[in-house]
Amino acid sequence: MIIKVCGMREPQNIREVAALAINWIGFIFYERSKRFVERCPTEQQATDSEQLSPKKVGVFVNATIESMMEKASTYKLDYLQLHGNESPEDCHTLQKRGYSLIKAFPIATKEDFEKTREYEGRVDYFLFDTRCEGYGGSGKRFDWSILTGYKGETPFLLSGGIRPENAEAIRNFRHPRFAGIDLNSGFEIEPGLKDIDKLKNFIQQILHPAVETGRAPSPTV
């Protein structure tokens, strides 16, 4: 399972989060976001010259192709997450230039999955977030049961209002294209600053529940 922690900003907090068992770390380059990072901390600043092991994701909303490419080059981003109204053609343009892409979709009903069809083959992952007035960051969770309506081939990440108390629901969630989770506001002390203990305990619960509860793992058949 991919674990992505998004909305990072402070170098020390980035170091602490990167030391956890996470796979991706996200930086938001959308100026209207409460977690907007004007200048992404460089790898050296964030990790005291040690390599930042999680993959770096740049989050953009309706940015130009040129500005995304510039940020990707400057900060050595591994993925570009497109969270606005970017077209399949925009994605294909970036894809042809060698960029790995995540396309976010606001979800409220099964009908919302229709729009993912034209992005098949144009991105590496979808990210399903709670539909709201803005571009994510609502802190609200949508009804995961409607994900049975997603029949696409592209793997997806779950986002939107995931909190520490959702660990069991995530452990029990099943879908053939489920690839991981995106964590943000549910684990914050304030916008852009993550609670390390909450993250650590949550990750322990979803990855190693038997260890966390002190129970022996169930035998496999």
Curated annotation (Swiss-Prot):
EC number(s) per entry: 5.3.1.24
Stated name of the protein: N-(5'-phosphoribosyl)anthranilate isomerase
Entries under Gene3D superfamilies matching the protein: Aldolase class I
GO BP terms in the entry: L-tryptophan biosynthetic process
Top-level taxon of the source organism: Bacteria
Pathway assigned in UniProt: Amino-acid biosynthesis; L-tryptophan biosynthesis; L-tryptophan from chorismate: step 3/5
Enzyme class: isomerase
Organism expressing this protein natively: Parabacteroides distasonis (strain ATCC 8503 / DSM 20701 / CIP 104284 / JCM 5825 / NCTC 11152)
Record keywords, A-Z: Amino-acid biosynthesis, Aromatic amino acid biosynthesis, Isomerase, Tryptophan biosynthesis
Protein family: Belongs to the TrpF family.
Catalytic activity: N-(5-phospho-beta-D-ribosyl)anthranilate = 1-(2-carboxyphenylamino)-1-deoxy-D-ribulose 5-phosphate
Disulfide bonds: none
GO terms, molecular function: phosphoribosylanthranilate isomerase activity
Gene name in the database record: trpF
CDD domains listed in its UniProt record: PRAI (cd00405)
